[in-house]
């Protein structure tokens, strides 16, 4: 037949049986990949430290998606929250992975069956015997099924009526766990950080989809609309389906990059804007201030700060810091976090408290500058010592630690002070193991960054695909001309089965 590689999908253009077959095979590949990827991630995942070495630092991609809808335990006896588990049941990480692989095998067999038995009576008009599909009715059936699935997820899985619930956490990603969520029907349901909206919106969207599906099954489209939108052409279905997919990809790109309601920071890592806005830094300062007001010492106040919160306040966990083309998990960059060393407070010889200006997300390198409470530069690590006026040695800077591993310790020697000033530029001071994974010191992005980049690109490609196929179906008569023999040739080809010379039609051009 000699079709070029970019035209091979013509084979299923007017062949519903094999169109079903290739979709089944595609779904088999997707399910098989998901299950296999989950098993691979489980093989390399280290569950020993959920606070400083969580799944997003290790580069896990499919595990966070399982965890956010209630799968948190392993047959290995561990949970991502750090507890030991004695009886996780079938719906563990391994169980979900094997279920996907089993589903993939069944879908493969179904694809083979539909490829072999492609010419079913179901695809023929009983009155004429000609191949015919009632595409508006098929659209309605799909809407009904999608609506039922959507409603079921919101009404049963999320609410815990028949399912585990979803991952719910506080605003700072400290206390997250899987729990049932009750739907909310007031304006608070539209708060993008309110998990109750997940339940209510799925219930509402499911009901709407079901009603819309019944409508499209029962009510025929007007003839003019049917013709104007080419509702009888399978390429119209392709075009509108691509539109639905690229729209969903754009939406989830935004919710992944900017939001954390359905993509919790405990599972996917912090967002870029939490670093840019000093989100965790402000919360830490608020907690310390409250503790001081209660009469605690500075050391006691900082010792109350959870390691988890301090760990978030570190630029290396910012997904925008990693660069798009540096392969590997975050741990391959700065290393495996082992401990929070504490909060460093710098002082000059005149007793002024100094703060290291933090590195913005955009910069790879940034000068180490220490400023006082009024924002005036009092010390730095100079590029050229010959012209230096504010060097650590000249200003006599010391550093004291509060909270963490170095709580209560003070350093006065300049090399040590400069070492911690460089670390403080990146946020809270942490200790990393760089040897185990041979980490190279170059920041990596988190799965949040990978997902966003991938789906933004796919959404753009699918948008162009929607325009292409939409144009083809709307202007098909312009492209191919009009006439009985041309329609026969373009629509159905010279063969009953495209490319199969044994099924040559009589009277075809």
UniProtKB/Swiss-Prot annotation:
It is found in: Plastid, Chloroplast thylakoid membrane. Keywords: Chlorophyll, Chloroplast, Chromophore, Membrane, Photosynthesis, Photosystem II, Plastid, Thylakoid, Transmembrane, Transmembrane helix. Binds multiple chlorophylls. PSII binds additional chlorophylls, carotenoids and specific lipids. One of its GO terms (molecular function) is electron transporter, transferring electrons within the cyclic electron transport pathway of photosynthesis activity. One of the components of the core complex of photosystem II (PSII). It binds chlorophyll and helps catalyze the primary light-induced photochemical processes of PSII. PSII is a light-driven water:plastoquinone oxidoreductase, using light energy to abstract electrons from H(2)O, generating O(2) and a proton gradient subsequently used for ATP formation. One of its GO terms (cellular component) is chloroplast thylakoid membrane. One of its GO terms (biological process) is photosynthetic electron transport in photosystem II. SUPFAM superfamilies: Photosystem II antenna protein-like. It is a multi-pass membrane protein. Pfam families: PSII. InterPro entries: PS_antenna-like (IPR000932), PS_II_antenna-like_sf (IPR036001), PSII_PsbB (IPR017486). Its main location: plastid. The keyword DNA damage does not apply. It comes from the Eukaryota. This is Photosystem II CP47 reaction center protein. The gene is psbB.
């Amino acid at each position: 037949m000699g079709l070029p590689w970019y035209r091979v999908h013509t084979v299923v253009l007017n062949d519903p049986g094999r169109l079903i077959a290739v979709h089944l095979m595609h779904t088999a590949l997707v399910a098989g990949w998901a299950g296999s990827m989950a098993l691979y991630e489980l093989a390399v995942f280290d569950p020993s430290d959920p606070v400083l070495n969580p799944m997003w630092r290790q580069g896990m991609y499919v595990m966070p998606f399982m965890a956010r809808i209630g799968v948190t335990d392993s047959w290995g006896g561990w949970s991502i929250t750090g507890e030991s588990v004695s009886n996780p049941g079938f719906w563990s990480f391994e169980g979900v992975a094997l279920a996907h692989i089993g589903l993939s095998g069944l879908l493969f067999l179904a694809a083979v069956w539909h490829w072999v038995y492609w010419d079913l009576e179901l695809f023929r008009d009983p009155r004429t015997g000609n191949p015919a599909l009632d595409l508006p009715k098929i659209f309605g059936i799909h809407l009904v099924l999608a609506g039922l699935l959507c409603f079921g997820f919101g009404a049963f899985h999320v609410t815990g009526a028949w399912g585990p619930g979803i991952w719910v956490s506080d605003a700072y990603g400290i206390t997250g766990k899987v729990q049932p969520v009750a739907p909310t029907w007031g304006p608070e349901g539209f708060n993008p950080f309110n998990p109750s909206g997940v339940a209510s919106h799925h219930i509402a969207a499911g009901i709407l989809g079901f009603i819309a599906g019944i409508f499209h099954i029962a009510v025929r489209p007007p003839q003019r609309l049917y013709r104007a939108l080419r509702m009888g052409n399978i390429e119209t279905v392709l075009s509108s389906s691509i539109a639905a997919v690229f729209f969903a990809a754009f939406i989830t790109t935004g919710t992944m990059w900017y939001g954390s309601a359905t993509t919790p920071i405990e599972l996917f890592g912090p967002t870029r804007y939490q670093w840019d806005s000093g989100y965790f830094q402000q919360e830490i300062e608020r907690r310390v201030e409250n503790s001081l007001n209660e009469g605690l010492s500075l050391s006691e106040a900082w010792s109350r700060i959870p390691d988890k919160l301090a760990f978030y306040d570190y630029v290396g966990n910012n997904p925008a810091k990693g660069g798009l083309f540096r392969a590997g998990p975050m741990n391959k960059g700065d290393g495996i976090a082992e401990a929070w060393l504490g909060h460093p407070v710098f002082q000059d010889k005149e007793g002024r408290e100094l703060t290291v200006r933090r590195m913005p997300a955009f910069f790879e390198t940034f000068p180490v500058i220490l400023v006082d409470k009024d924002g005036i530069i009092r010390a730095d690590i100079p590029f050229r010592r010959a012209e230096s006026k504010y060097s650590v040695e000249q200003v006599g800077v010391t550093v004291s630690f509060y909270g963490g591993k170095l709580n209560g310790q003070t350093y006065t020697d300049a090399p040590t002070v400069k070492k911690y000033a460089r670390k403080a530029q990146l946020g809270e001071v942490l200790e990393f193991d760089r040897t185990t994974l041979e980490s190279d010191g170059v920041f990596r992005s988190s799965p949040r960054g990978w997902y966003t980049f991938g789906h933004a690109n796919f959404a753009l490609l699918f948008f162009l695909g929607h325009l292409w196929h939409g144009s083809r179906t709307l202007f098909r008569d312009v492209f191919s001309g009009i006439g009985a023999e041309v329609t026969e040739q373009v629509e159905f080809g010279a063969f009953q089965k495209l490319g199969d010379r044994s099924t040559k039609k009589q009277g075809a051009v």
